[in-house]
Amino acid sequence: MNCCRTLRELEIQVGEKVFKNIKTVMKAFKLIDVNKTGLVRPQELRRVLETFCLKLRDEEYEKFSKHYNIHNDTAVDYNVFLKNLSINNDLNLRYCMGNQEVSLENQQARNSKKERLLGSASSEDIWRNYSLDDIERNFCLELSKSYEKIEKALSAGDPCKGGYVSFNYLKIVLDTFIYQIPRRIFIQLMKRFGLKATTKINWKQFLTSFHEPQGLQVSNKGPLTKRNSINSRSESRKENIITKLFRCTEDRSASLKKALLIINTKPDGPITREEFRYILNCVAIKLSDSEFKELMQILDPGDTGVVNTSMFIDLIEENCRMRKTSPCTDAKTPFLLAWDSVEEIVHDTIARNLQAFYNMLRSYDLGDTGLIGRNNFKKIMHVFCPFLTNAHFIKLCSKIQDIGSGRILYKKLLACIGIDGPPTVSPVLVPKDQLLSEHLQKDEQQQPDLSERTKPTEDKTTLTKKMTTEEVIEKFRKYIQQQDPAFKKRFLDFSKEPNGKINVHDFRKILEDTGMPMDDDQYALLTTKIGFEKEGMSYLDFAAGFEDPPMRGLETTPPQPPTPSKSYVNSHLITAEECLKLFPRRLKESFRDPYSAFFKTDVDRDGIINMHDLHRLLLHLLLNLKDDEFERFLGLLGLRLSVTLNFREFQNLCEKRPWRTDEAPQRLIRPKQKVADSELACEQAHQYLVTKAKNRWSDLSKNFLETDNEGNGILRRRDIKNALYGFDIPLTPREFEKLWARYNTEGKGHITYQEFLQKLGINYSPAVHQPCAEDYFNFMGHFTKPQQLQEEMKELQQSTEKAMAARDKLMDLHQDISKAFTKIDKSKTNYISICKMQKVLEECGCSLTEGELTHLLNSWGVSRHENAINYLDFLRAVENSKSTGAQPKEKEESMPISFATLNPQEVVRKIQEVVESSQLALSTAFSALDKEDTGFVKATEFGQVLKDFCYKLMDNQYHYFLRKLRIHLTPYINWKYFLQNFSCFLEEVRISAAHKHLFENELKLVFTKWIID
């Protein structure tokens, strides 16, 4: 259409379209007019006209609406609008319009005549006389009659064309075009079609899956649930029954063969006519009596009453091969079979395999609740009833589904079959994988003949073979190792509690109830072998005898059963009491001690674990509990979901130690007490050192490298750290500093073996506590490993290079890191923890270990407060490092020398430059400390003064400097001699490169004057 239509043309076209579909248009208006006011919004009026009549351009609709006094801000009386439209077009609407009240009454009267089920939505008494199946059948019939109208109405309620409408809107549409249903019944009805009241409805998918358009004419003749089923009587009699059967089973041959094998696992075995007809009705086609009789004349010409399955399967395979060579061009039609026939074959199949079916159900319901998840139930049904389609499965679940939880009441299904309780022989639960493999591999077993198969199930279960002692012991071991709940429950039915004892008579009854009957001689031998005493045996005593491989009292050890599959162990749920019993043992098997378990569980390294961390630890130990059982487990431990544990509390749980009066639970003090928890980690590391020093001093001393001039061993910070890491006891830098301060109380930087052992509470023995026997080299009376200085120099150089690379990367990512910090700081405190800072840097592309990050922060002078960092200071430090590196060379001399980025070779030279340029200031600072003017200050005070003048001098650089001067073990340093002769030392360092053998002797002479014994 290239030009706009005139007003007259619009009136004629709209009028013709409206009055051809006047009933549908009126229903659409009333659908929108929920409150029955007779008014709709102008936008809704236009949407109805464009949906049911014709599309209008904006200028056309503006012209049309102006003529009928329709304004954007005023509601429209659609009855008046239709009357005016009819008057302008000289049409008579009396047959469908008239008074609005009369129209509503007539509409209700017509709705009441539609079906006997129709009535007032508010009155549920009428609906109670009909089952949900009856309602569904009539509902489907009415929907098929109004399919196109419902489709248009749902499309009108989807202006965005997204394909979704609300559940309430769907109900309004269906109530308008079909009949009004009480909301409670409507929700139940929609659940049958897979719709939920809490989610948006994909109305296109609903209509497509619920009712195909090409089946409208068929569905008008009968209920929709059978609209796709094959009515054999409607087929031509001239068509051969075999040809028809093959046509219907073309895409279902695999399911048909599997169903036949489930009924008869022997491929060439016979099958009764009734069984064969059930399978055909479910999987392929529902045959009439005459058609089935015609088929039997071909498959059973001798009228023996049985069908040879191998012959029929061969016919199917031959038909498939022929169709592959000459494909059929006819369109395939999916078949939805009658539910009555499907339900009958399902019940019959379950009854034939009752024991295996019940065992598999119980393997998913260890607590015997009678409930099973929908997905698990579907897996089981596909094993036993592979012919079950999704539509049939939904139909089955709708009858036995628990409305509250959505789970399946499988005991209700068993009751429908006529089984009120468990099978005659109590099931012996085995892993689900084993059940599946056993059932799917039935063709490997010998199948009894037809006469024996047709006997009642009860006759088979009563004939039970007597078991030997070895077989029973084998089963016992399997029960205990797999934690079989059925056997344990039966045992506790007699003993009442795990510690309660049962007598010999009750024990034999347990064996018989669990499918292990024995004769008197074998039973007497069994009680002797398992150590059954006169006073009886408890379940705990019984289980303990089978947990360890060498069972007590056994003359011959039976072969070990196969270890249960990992999938079974992971899915095996246990009770809170079982978890309480297994937790300490599993912890010892998986971890060396409680500290290792706590360290692995405490992922954020804050010294605190919550109940989520504890639950994750249980899963790691293969202790799987449901959520409610986990809460019960916490209750047995005296805990709640909201509490936290420090290491001491966790250790008490693992080792079941009584609380001491000085060990108040940390959660009673405050939720997070990180300082106390770091001390607990230090205490654990200290206990490790105590144990090693007492029992394995030779292993511990391998990490101690130095002795003093008298041959006594000395320890430094890195020696203790290397020892802890060698024993797999890593500590955070903050925790290690606390531990080192515990030993280095005088701040000398080193301690002797005597001092170290005294801190450990061990008496020093010169004969035992000796340094590790290695070659040492003498430097000024101190024996140090020759490689030590080289290793430390290399380590210091590597750390400096890493720090420079990290600084460059942080400069490049400065903006991204700043945004990430701002986003994570929701409380706007400007502080974040070290762990979170690590995580943010890693996400931004700069991965640093805690040690590297700590080194970087210390080099930039960024302080920490309770293991938290002010990220604004951190960002400022990054900016300053960036600006410092970008300054021109002529300004570098005016800036203080930063030692953070210097390599080890430059440290001594730079300190010498600082000393030369700041002689007077250094002398003043040392004099302030040396108030008595002795010329000596403590080594710690000496280091602090140097750090004040040497910008960002690191601890490892300072200690390297002291060892380079050979004064790292001196408690007091002559600062006056240092200021006067330090430049001479630097000159001798240069000479030593060419005259190393002379330098050592000269070095002794130069620095002997520094040291006062």
Curated annotation (Swiss-Prot):
Annotated positions binding Ca(2+): D602, D604, D606, D613
Region (Disordered): 441-460
Residues modified to Phosphothreonine: T732
Superkingdom of the source species: Eukaryota
Keywords: Calcium, Cell projection, Cilium, Cytoplasm, Cytoskeleton, Flagellum, Metal-binding, Nucleus, Phosphoprotein, Repeat, Repressor, Transcription, Transcription regulation
GO biological process terms on file: flagellated sperm motility
GO molecular function: calcium ion binding
Subcellular localization: Nucleus; Cytoplasm, Cytoskeleton, Flagellum axoneme
GO cellular component, one term: sperm flagellum
Domain EF-hand: from-to ranges: 20-55, 145-180, 251-286, 287-322, 352-387, 482-517, 589-624, 695-730, 731-766, 812-847, 917-952
PANTHER family to which the protein is assigned, alphabetical: EF-HAND CALCIUM-BINDING DOMAIN-CONTAINING PROTEIN 6, EF-HAND CALCIUM-BINDING DOMAIN-CONTAINING PROTEIN 6-RELATED
Functional description taken from the UniProt entry: Negatively regulates the androgen receptor by recruiting histone deacetylase complex, and protein DJ-1 antagonizes this inhibition by abrogation of this complex. Microtubule inner protein (MIP) part of the dynein-decorated doublet microtubules (DMTs) in cilia axoneme, which is required for motile cilia beating.
Quaternary structure, from the entry: Microtubule inner protein component of sperm flagellar doublet microtubules. Binds PARK7. Part of a ternary complex containing PARK7, EFCAB6/DJBP and AR.
Protein name: EF-hand calcium-binding domain-containing protein 6
Gene source species: Pongo abelii (Sumatran orangutan)
